[in-house]
Amino acid sequence: MPKARIVETDSGIEGEATVAIYDTMQRKLRDRGWIETNDVIQSGITEGLALEIGPGPGYLGLEWLKHTEGTQLKGLDISADMIAVAERNAKEYGLTSRVEYVRSNGNKMPFADSMFDAVFTNGSLHEWADPKNTMNEIWRVLKPGGRIFISDLRRDMFVLMKWFLYMASKPKEIRPGLISSINAAYTPDELKELIEDTKLASCKVSGNLIGVKLTGKK
């Protein structure tokens, strides 16, 4: 049995120094090919207007835009400091005309019903203050037939995998945050139970050595 979840902050990553460290870490993951752009695309999210929840510095969504044609993206993040970094990175990518970042949380998204062709997120699920409500909001803003991709760490990963992630995390200042994220993450069984009485109940939950994933369609 894994240890009980230790709930992490739902206030987002704030502070110029902290945000800069996180941006450096995410940029290194991108450069190593360790962000999940291919997984998002392989899930069928390849066209139209997508919503990314918790984009952080923006690399997953920006890489998705880079590798798809004619797509548009809105990023929803609670952190003003992180949005500023994401906007700077979008400018670096030359993609400012295709992406807009909005400051809000997932409990009451500032978007119309049936607005998006897809919703995706990586690494934010464990931070959601009211995950069931956020899942229902995802369903609300999706068009009929719209696709869903949610991925995150898993709390019950093998100790060896946790050690590997810890040692691979650079800069080293990010390591305490990694551990707190793992401790707050869901197991695949917990995620299956969590979605049972939400609009995402028909979605598929799967796992790998370090993470959990939810995919489906409206």
Language-model-derived ranges and their functions:
Residues S151-L214:
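C-terminal alpha-helical "lid/dimerization" subdomain adjacent to the S-adenosyl-L-methionine
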Residues L95-T96, A112, A201:
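Conserved H-loop
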Residues M1-I45, E63:
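Conserved class I S-adenosyl-L-methionine
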Residues N107-A118:
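A short acidic, Gly/Pro-enriched loop at the edge of an enzyme's catalytic core
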Residues A118-A129:
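A short SAM/SAH-binding and catalytic strip from SAM-dependent methyltransferases
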Residues K132-P144:
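A short glycine-rich, Lys/Arg-flanked "PGG" loop and its adjoining helix->strand segment in the class I
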Residues L51, P57-K108:
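Class I SAM-dependent methyltransferase SAM/SAH-binding core
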